[in-house]
């Protein structure tokens, strides 16, 4: 996502990422969000030791990666969808991108470019949380389509949440539902 002059610059990006990694979610970012997290020190492997939950910390230490991965400029979000497609193909986690325990977020979006990227994610089947509503609140039909109706078609949908901690909760709830559906929330013997 972008930076938005209507909110404290970088705050939502960093708070959302910190909350997700604290809760053992590997975060992939692009553009301004990635830069915000880099400035906050989250794009170095040592960040996993200080900020990540225990299982994410273990994975990051074993592989030697930070808990937040930089995937390129803001227009490189297709790389994230390509990674999701590869996880789907190689990992056998469902039949469609919409089956994956993954979500998108743009907590400080301000440009139409970010909106277009969000639509690309939703059309690909992902749940996307935006920090403030799209300019569609005047039409119940359009709002209902973007925030629910598309889920019946693509598996993806939008939701708005300005508070980054509450946005993280919504993303985590979505991830847990997808993990339950894939039956990968079952405790198993550790391999690492």
Label for each model-derived stretch:
Residues 1-192:
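Anaerobic metallocofactor- and corrinoid-dependent redox/one-carbon enzyme cores
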């Amino acid at each position: 996502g972008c930076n938005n002059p209507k909110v404290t610059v970088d705050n939502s990006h960093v708070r959302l990422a910190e909350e997700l990694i604290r809760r053992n979610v590997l975060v992939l970012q692009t553009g301004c969000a990635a830069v915000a997290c880099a400035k906050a020190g989250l794009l170095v492997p040592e960040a996993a030791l200080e900020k990540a939950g225990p299982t994410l910390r273990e994975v990051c230490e074993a592989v030697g990666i930070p808990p937040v991965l930089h995937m390129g400029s803001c227009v490189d979000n297709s790389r994230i969808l390509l990674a999701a497609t590869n996880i789907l193909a190689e990992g056998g986690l469902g039949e469609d991108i919409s089956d994956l325990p993954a979500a998108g977020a743009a907590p400080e979006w301000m440009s139409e470019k970010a909106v277009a990227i969000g639509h690309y994610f939703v059309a690909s089947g992902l749940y996307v949380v935006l920090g403030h509503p799209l300019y569609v609140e005047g039409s119940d039909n359009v709002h209902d389509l973007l925030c629910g109706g598309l889920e019946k078609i693509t598996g993806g949908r939008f939701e708005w949440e300005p508070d980054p901690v509450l946005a993280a909760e919504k993303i985590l709830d979505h991830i847990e539902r997808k993990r339950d559906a894939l039956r990968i929330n079952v405790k198993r013997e550790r391999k690492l």
